[in-house]
Structures are given as structure tokens and as C-alpha cells.
């Protein structure tokens, strides 16, 4: 069972240099929700690193290839119950961490919207337009070079992001930089060797657009990558035992731990260098 966090509340701060001339280049690339010209309540800070063309990458997810079709799938008879199933697995892990929260690889903003994540970034501008309409404050950037100041986020979410990342160690270094004391990383992924991951791995092997560069990990491999990057896994949940290709899907309950055959796994981890000195706010029993 996951217990609610007693992490220190993050103090509000200003978006650094928002009105300064130095920030004009990055302001031009920020995609704020419609009608919003300034960040509300200044929960978090942008730094003055402009997202220049050399820090941008080609679309690194299926959402970047065809954002409209990708987003519409979540409203389909298949997509709706699967989305609800995956969100139910992620929610208890991310809700224990303080605001503000950031999603790396936010895509069209489906998960951010449902999980209370206010900030997101993605290399696909097309996908970000959907996220912006959902009220997410977004930036056209990649997880290896995040335009936010350090130690300001209570949680960083990566849902279906790591399989498209070429350098996991780099993105984990940035995540550690971004997390405030007591904050945590929450990852949702398709474990290699399960029917759903195998389906997308086959598409990747065939060079299908949007999947060509995908790489999948087992839970053990991912946990080792996290450990090598200075994280400690503190909770695990799994769901989605229904295989691909069914005519109808039901919303599944999530279970603590990792079960054989589960098509979706959610993991939360904390930076070992910045854990609370007493008991940790997250516990798995």
C-alpha cells in the first residue's frame, strides 16, 4: 500500500526573467493555454535557456508522427478503457508527491490532464497544441535539456516516454536536477516480453513510422538503469492483462507489485541523494 507523502510543501517562486529581453526567445516557443499571457501564480520557474533549433529533436513518439490520430485513439472504444486502466495504475504513485509536477514527453496531454500535471514538454509541436488545449503549460523541448530551473518539481512523470529515449542516463540526470527534496519520478511503460510491448516492438522492427526507434525494457532492466542513475525504486504497480487485438476492453484494476504477463507497469523512484532523513513518504508493503 502506498502512503500519502509528508514531503515539504514547495514554496512559490517567480518565473525567472519572464518579462526580461533575455526571455523573449523562449517566450516565443512557450505554448500557453489560450488567453494566458503570463504564468499563473508563478508555481515554477523557467530558466533563461532558449529552446533553440539545436536543442530540438525530431518527433520521438507516435504522437509526434500523427498527433490527431494518436489523440483520437484515446476516445475510441479500445482507447478509453485502456487509458482509464493505465491512469488508475499511475494515480496513487504520483498523487503522493507535491505540486508542481512536470511530464517529460507529455504528447497530447492525456495523462497530464487526468493526473494533475500542470507542466509538460515534448519535441512535437503538433502534439503540444493538443496538450495546451487541455490546460497544460507546455514547452517544445526534450528531456535531456529541460528549460526549467533546478529543484522546483515535486514529481516528474514519464508515461510511454523511455522507449523513445536514446540516452536514458541523460534524461535521468536532468530529472534529478529538476526534482525538489522529497520529490519523485513516476514512470509508466510496457515491459519487454509482454504481448503489448511485443506488438510495438514488431512494428519498430518493420520500421513503422512512430515506432521505428522504440526500445523496450523489462522491469528489472529499467530498475537497474534507475539505480545506476542514483534513483531508488520505492513502489511498483501493474495492470493490463488483456492482450492486444480484442474487440472490446474492460477497465482493469491495478495491483501492487509486478505480476507476470502484466502489459503495463508503473514505477515510482526517488533520488537517493535527496531522500528525507527519517521515514520516506512512500512505502510499499
From Swiss-Prot:
The organism's place on the tree of life at top rank: Bacteria
Q: Name one GO molecular function term.
A: methyltransferase activity
**Which factors induce or repress this protein, as stated in its UniProt record?**
A member of the dormancy regulon. Induced in response to reduced oxygen tension (hypoxia), low levels of nitric oxide (NO) and carbon monoxide (CO). It is hoped that this regulon will give insight into the latent, or dormant phase of infection.
Span of the signal peptide:
none
State the InterPro entries in the record. Methyltransf_11, SAM-dependent_MTases_sf
Q: Which Pfam families match?
A: Methyltransf_11
Q: Which Gene3D superfamilies match?
A: Vaccinia Virus protein VP39
Q: Which family does it belong to?
A: Belongs to the methyltransferase superfamily.
Q: What is the official name of this protein in its record? A: Uncharacterized protein Rv2003c
Write down the species: Mycobacterium tuberculosis (strain ATCC 25618 / H37Rv)
Amino acid at each position: 500500500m502506498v502512503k500519502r507523502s509528508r514531503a515539504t510543501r514547495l514554496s512559490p517562486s517567480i518565473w525567472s526573467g519572464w518579462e526580461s529581453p533575455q526571455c523573449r526567445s523562449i517566450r516565443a516557443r512557450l505554448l500557453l493555454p489560450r488567453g494566458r499571457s503570463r504564468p499563473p501564480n508563478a508555481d515554477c520557474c523557467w530558466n533563461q535557456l532558449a529552446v533553440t533549433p539545436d536543442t530540438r529533436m525530431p518527433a520521438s513518439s507516435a504522437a509526434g508522427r500523427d498527433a490527431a490520430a494518436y489523440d483520437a485513439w484515446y476516445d475510441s472504444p479500445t482507447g478509453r478503457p485502456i487509458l482509464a486502466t493505465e491512469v488508475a495504475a499511475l494515480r496513487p504513485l504520483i498523487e503522493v508527491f507535491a505540486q508542481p509536477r512536470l511530464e517529460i514527453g507529455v504528447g497530447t496531454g492525456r495523462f497530464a490532464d487526468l493526473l494533475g500535471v500542470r507542466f509538460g514538454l515534448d519535441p512535437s509541436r503538433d502534439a503540444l497544441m493538443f496538450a495546451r488545449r487541455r490546460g497544460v503549460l507546455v514547452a517544445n523541448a526534450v528531456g535531456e535539456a529541460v528549460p526549467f530551473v533546478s529543484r522546483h518539481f515535486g514529481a516528474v512523470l514519464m508515461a510511454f516516454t523511455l522507449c523513445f529515449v536514446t540516452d536514458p542516463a541523460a534524461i535521468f540526470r536532468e530529472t534529478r536536477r529538476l526534482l525538489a527534496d522529497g520529490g519523485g519520478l513516476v514512470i509508466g511503460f510496457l515491459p519487454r516480453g509482454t504481448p503489448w510491448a511485443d506488438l510495438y516492438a514488431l512494428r519498430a522492427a518493420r520500421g513503422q513510422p512512430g515506432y521505428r526507434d522504440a526500445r523496450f525494457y523489462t522491469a528489472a532492466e529499467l530498475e537497474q538503469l534507475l539505480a545506476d542513475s542514483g534513483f531508488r525504486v520505492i513502489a511498483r504497480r501493474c495492470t493490463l492483462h488483456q492482450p492486444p487485438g480484442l474487440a472490446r476492453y474492460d477497465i482493469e484494476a491495478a495491483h501492487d507489485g509486478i505480476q507476470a504477463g502484466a502489459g503495463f507497469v508503473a514505477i515510482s523512484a526517488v533520488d537517493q541523494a535527496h531522500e528525507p532523513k527519517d521515514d520516506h513518504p512512500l512505502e510499499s508493503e
